[in-house]
């Protein structure tokens, strides 16, 4: 049995997790990452830094039989066969699959363990102004896109729809590997959006 160390782009991994080509073996624990850890992982991706290795086991070996299950947040047609089982990198790949694809909603928890549904955005002007400000530019908001204060009575920031995202200059990260160009072309001045994606 040999080992291979192929290099794949993140977009390929996202495509494979969403299609079910990569699934989890039944012995893997559940998804447990906290909101801030996910936000920091997204900062790492945007900076283009390495984020660790992923270890996959090719399926089809008659001597190794594990029951596969979908990456959390991915809904597969029953009977979808996995080509690979994810042995290492589950928390990172699950976080990235949920945050960077589909509706972008990540089922996570806060530092006190409370369950949350979050979405992630990047303020394009801040991210483009200085590469050292990417950490500051990436924000986590409730799944509805609305940040509230005063026990939910006051709206601090509303990113609940595309018009409001454009108005405030926040790009939804779930479009980063998807239909980003449609979103960018709807901006009054699409040049910064195109520069951001490059």
Predicted segments with their positions:
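Basic- and aromatic-enriched surface patches that contact anionic nucleotides/nucleic acids
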Residues: 2-35, 39-198
């Amino acid at each position: 049995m040999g080992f291979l160390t192929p290099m794949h782009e993140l977009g390929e991994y996202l495509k494979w997790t969403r299609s079910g080509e990569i699934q989890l073996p039944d012995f893997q624990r559940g998804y447990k990452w906290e909101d801030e850890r996910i936000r920091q992982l997204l900062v790492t991706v945007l900076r283009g830094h390495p984020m660790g290795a992923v270890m996959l086991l090719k399926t089809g070996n008659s001597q190794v039989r594990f029951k596969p299950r979908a990456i959390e947040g991915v809904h597969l047609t029953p009977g979808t066969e996995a080509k690979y089982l994810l042995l290492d990198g589950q928390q990172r790949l699950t976080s990235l699959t949920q945050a960077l694809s589909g509706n972008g909603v990540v089922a996570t928890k806060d530092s006190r363990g409370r369950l949350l549904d979050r979405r992630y955005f990047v303020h394009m002007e801040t991210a483009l102004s200085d590469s050292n400000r990417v950490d500051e530019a990436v924000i986590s908001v409730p799944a509805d896109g609305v940040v509230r204060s005063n026990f939910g009575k006051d709206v601090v920031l509303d990113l609940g729809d595309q018009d409001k995202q454009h108005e405030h200059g926040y790009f939804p990260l779930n479009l980063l590997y998807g239909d980003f160009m449609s979103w960018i072309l709807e901006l009054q001045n699409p040049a910064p959006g195109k520069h951001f994606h490059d």
